[in-house]
Amino acid sequence: MVLGKVKKIPVEEPRLTKEQKIERDLLIKKKVSKLANSIRIPPAIYQFRTVLSEHDTKKFVELFMKYRPENKQEKRIRLQSEDPKKGPKPILVKFGLKHVTNLIETKKAKLVLISASVDPIEVVIFLPTLCRKMGVSYAIVENSTLLGKLVNLKTTSCVCLCDVRPEDEGSFKEMLRTADAIFLDNYETHLSTWGGLPQKEADEKQ
């Protein structure tokens, strides 16, 4: 023991029950929501409030599910076959922030889905601007869990498709038009629209 140094007694934090954890999480969400509506939200962040409708999201997910990567069991079966690399290279959904960013920068990505529920949102805040710069179609969806299901993960921040099979080209072009009409064509509007406080109150606070 060092003279003059106070010995710290470890304090055990109380273990919360499942109900207490749910109550705590709800309280945090309420505080975040209250804060979000009491300050001005910059356009770069507020643009993530514009998401695909439930109907459009369902159509996008159905197409992306056709190109979902193989899971562990499917991979094991493939590797046990006589020639695992036999056949053409499969068209699959690409995921992972760095990988998707690289595909956008090289203009290989054709449609990017970005999650609006990423925390912190700063992780993906640059993606819409990057897509606009490179001329890549993008859409924002409400839930990162939904995107995770497309690639056999719990959650993921973004996914993209670089190509589709000939039989899906018609529906894919329709989805590109839908995504562009909501996001790419309205990029300037989204990047000039502030959120949070009503405009009058925000101007008064300034």
From Swiss-Prot:
Family: Belongs to the eukaryotic ribosomal protein eL8 family.
Cystine pairs: none
Keyword Transferase belongs to the record: no
Protein origin, superkingdom: Eukaryota
Lineage: Eukaryota, Fungi, Fungi incertae sedis, Microsporidia, Unikaryonidae
PANTHER family hit by this protein: RIBOSOMAL PROTEIN L7AE FAMILY MEMBER (PTHR23105)
Keywords: Cytoplasm, Ribonucleoprotein, Ribosomal protein
Pfam families, alphabetized: Ribosomal_L7Ae
Molecular function terms from GO: RNA binding
Protein name: Large ribosomal subunit protein eL8
GO CC terms: cytoplasm; ribonucleoprotein complex; ribosome
Subunit structure, interactors included: Component of the large ribosomal subunit.
InterPro entries: eL8/uL1-like, Ribosomal_eL30-like_sf, Ribosomal_eL8/eL30/eS12/Gad45, Ribosomal_eL8/Nhp2, Ribosomal_eL8_euk
Compartment(s) of residence: Cytoplasm
Gene expressing this chain: RPL7A
Origin species: Encephalitozoon cuniculi (strain GB-M1) (Microsporidian parasite)
